[in-house]
Amino acid sequence: MGQKVHPNGVRLGITKTWHSTWYANNKDFSDNLGNDFKVRHFLMQKLSKALVSRIIIERPAKSIRVTVYTARPGLIIGKKGEDIEKLRKNIARISGVPTQLNIAEVRKPELDAKLLADNIASQLERRVVFRRAMKRVVQNAMRLGAKGIKVEVSGRLSGAEIARTEWYREGRVPLHTLRADIDYSLSEARTTYGIIGIKVWVFKGEILGDVLLLNTGYSSDQTINNSSKKKHKTRI
């Protein structure tokens, strides 16, 4: 029986970058790794309504730099920057080192797999019919320039006694093409009938060298490092 490899993991170092980038010796590695998980868990809980796409963590010179990609930057920053300063202090307390917190806006949340999966999960928890939720997300993504999208939901759909899997696809989603920029994410909807899993694949275009042929939807350009010469960095 054929199985699918993780679309993000197979492209690491080719067209995708790691979400944590830092170097540590054997003594400090486990502490830094644990701190990364704590910081991410804290931010995902604290910013559950801010439509967070991903969190990038870097550790330059005994400090930590956290970049949060969100579709609602104003909700995180708060009035006169009060909320972001509280977040920065909490992250510094968790990590125990000086902290720099950056907020980056996701300009096209309709092309972000994480935000799309969370959107479908939210609709299912509000008892929206799953087919309607899937079709709405697919149509919005294709309208805003996606080359292809696939959405899959599995579980006790509409309260059925037997769990099943249903999917909907439009356009191209070439999972075997490593130069294809495939954004993949997984989310869960906690309904009264149990947990429903949601998987989303978004094909944004092809990457030739360091040039992405379709806008990724982020406000800042993300450089793609195809070189394997930087051995002094530990990527997670």
UniProtKB/Swiss-Prot annotation:
One GO cellular component, as annotated: cytosolic small ribosomal subunit
A GO term, aspect molecular function: rRNA binding
UniProt name for this protein: Small ribosomal subunit protein uS3
Keyword flag Signal: no
Source species, domain of life: Bacteria
Family according to the record: Belongs to the universal ribosomal protein uS3 family.
Domain KH type-2: 39-107
NCBIfam families linked: rpsC_bact
Keyword RNA-binding: yes
UniProt-listed HAMAP family: Ribosomal_uS3_B
PANTHER family linked to this entry: 30S/40S RIBOSOMAL PROTEIN S3, SMALL RIBOSOMAL SUBUNIT PROTEIN US3C
